[in-house]
Amino acid sequence: MNYQWPSPGKLNLFLYVTGCRADGYHYLQTLFQLIEYGDTIKIFVTNNGRIRLFTIMNDLVCRDNLIIRAAKLLQYYCWPNKKPVFGADIFLDKILPIGSGLGGASSNAATVLMVLNQQWRCYLNKHVLMHLGLMLGADVPFFLYGRSAFAEGIGNILIPVFVPKKWYLILIPPVRISTFWGFQMYELENHCYSPFRSMRELLSVSFHNDFEEIIKKISPEIKIFFACLSQFALARLTGTGSCIFAEFKTEQLAYQVQSYLPSWVSSIITRGINLSPLHQKLLKCTAYSSIIFLS
């Protein structure tokens, strides 16, 4: 039995806001790049129906955490109107910064959904899991999909894209930006929506993030981090922030630029990947291989 599972992060290589729905969700076009850097989740199935979440320091985490919500949603779907047969003790080793634009919470939720779907012997198909994921957050379907991808709609219409191997230097400002707040600021700033374009066109032009100027305007810390990185490379925002990144053809170049940064600038270097390590690990589980998201 496997107990330890990867929960990878992501970057938005470009991000355009193309409209807004009546329910407040925004239409977007983005290129999701999976990265090796990510959290680790240990999951132990129990037979008492309880869902408990602990950090690596063994602190019990609040009940509203997206991991707990994901597990309870799966319970409700698999055992409606009756006591769940299984529960889980979940231990989270969190290294992806919160409110960073690296997708940590969404990735955590996707990992829990996929692993418990197997270990609780629910065996829901990918379409059902994607539906459940979207109920938790707009980025969760991408992590369930498990491939670097072009996304439209509210992020739930996904087309696989092979992204050439790159290394990424990611700067981590000491601020958190919630996705909800970022989109609120977009509306308050009265920004015009970007025109809807084809994937081919977007992949052929310079990449851009519609939130970049807004976030720099309202966060002095992020603006400073942008200035630091922009001296040596093309700096870009991921998601609604707060993290900033630059891409490099080699690991050596990424480390070279990192060495130029001031000591007070927190940063990490990671490699872009096209297939989620979670999906690769689940593929090794015979019972799960028939419903993994590679079709």
Swiss-Prot record:
Pathway: Isoprenoid biosynthesis; isopentenyl diphosphate biosynthesis via DXP pathway; isopentenyl diphosphate from 1-deoxy-D-xylulose 5-phosphate: step 3/6
Reactions mediated catalytically: 4-CDP-2-C-methyl-D-erythritol + ATP = 4-CDP-2-C-methyl-D-erythritol 2-phosphate + ADP + H(+)
Residues annotated to bind ATP: 97-107
InterPro entries assigned: GHMP_kinase_C_dom, GHMP_kinase_C_sf, GHMP_kinase_N_dom, IspE, Ribosomal_Su5_D2-typ_SF, Ribsml_uS5_D2-typ_fold_subgr
UniProt keyword ATP-binding, yes or no: yes
EC number: 2.7.1.148
Presence of keyword Kinase: yes
Gene3D superfamilies documented for this protein: 3.30.230.10, GHMP kinase, C-terminal domain
Purpose of the protein: Catalyzes the phosphorylation of the position 2 hydroxy group of 4-diphosphocytidyl-2C-methyl-D-erythritol.
Protein name: 4-diphosphocytidyl-2-C-methyl-D-erythritol kinase
Species this chain originates from: Blochmanniella pennsylvanica (strain BPEN)
